[in-house]
């Protein structure tokens, strides 16, 4: 239990949707709809496309619009095209992509509003987080899928909203810290090359060091499950 507090993936899924997923995987039933989840290979691509296009619509209406996405890989042509359209409309897009990224930044009139950074440190990060400004009604999602054809079209993947206010703050904190990383982050340029973040005038910050420190602080605090517990060794067998 204690190690699970230190090492784990962020997860928050409603029980009815979780049951429906396992029923689908087992062949017991095919859900006609979900309460909160979007599930690949049928519904997930449509969900992402709608979320991106909503930001595009808001930008065209002159409203503030923003997308932040963290993932391992980005190479889906359809998603990239939607991001280009959003950028051209004025949506500010910040992408944290640790691995493959086929999107090209810095194309005049197409991707000038897109920033891509990669953070590769001592630990392999596996979380996928998606933030949409939504005209001030901010929405946060987490899930298992990268923006790749195999994840959106050929695998069972899930996306779920982060609804609890405290969890939203925690997840947004993760994004903010990674966007502030000046030690391990590399920024993608228009020529396809990555370069270390320009640290001039900025605080030296490693996002993974911050998360490790916070994890150690959290695990050192007595949790509800451990309060009042005292280990009493058994008497030796005579």
Give each language-model segment a name:
Residues 1-8, 13:
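Single conserved hydrophobic/aromatic residue that forms the stacking wall/gate
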Residues 29-33, 41-238:
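PLD/PLD-like phosphodiesterase catalytic module centered on the HKD motif
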Residues 14-32, 46-47:
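Short, compositionally biased "basic patch" segments
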Residues 9, 23, 173-177:
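Short intrinsically disordered coil segments
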């Amino acid at each position: 239990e204690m190690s699970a507090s230190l090492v784990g993936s962020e997860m928050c899924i409603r029980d009815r949707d979780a049951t429906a997923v396992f029923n689908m995987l087992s062949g017991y039933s095919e859900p006609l709809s979900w309460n909160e989840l979007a599930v690949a290979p049928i519904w997930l691509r449509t969900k992402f496309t709608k979320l991106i296009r909503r930001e595009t619509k808001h930008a065209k209406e002159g409203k503030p619009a923003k997308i932040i996405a963290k993932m391992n890989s980005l190479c889906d042509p359809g998603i990239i095209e939607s991001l280009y359209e959003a950028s051209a409309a004025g949506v500010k897009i910040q992408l944290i992509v640790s691995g493959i990224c086929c999107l090209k930044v810095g194309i005049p009139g197409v991707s000038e509003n897109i920033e891509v950074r990669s953070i590769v440190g001592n630990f392999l990060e596996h979380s996928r987080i998606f933030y949409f400004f939504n005209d001030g009604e901010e929405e946060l999602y987490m899930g298992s899928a990268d923006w790749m054809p195999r994840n959106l079209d050929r695998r069972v993947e899930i996306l779920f909203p982060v609804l609890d206010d405290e969890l939203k703050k925690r997840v947004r904190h993760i994004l903010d810290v990674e966007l502030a990383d000046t030690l391990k982050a590399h920024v993608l340029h228009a020529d396809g090359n990555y370069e270390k973040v320009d640290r001039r005038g900025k605080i030296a910050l490693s996002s993974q060091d911050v998360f490790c420190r916070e994890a150690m602080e959290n695990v050192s605090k007595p949790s509800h499950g451990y309060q009042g517990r005292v280990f009493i060794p058994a008497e030796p067998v005579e």
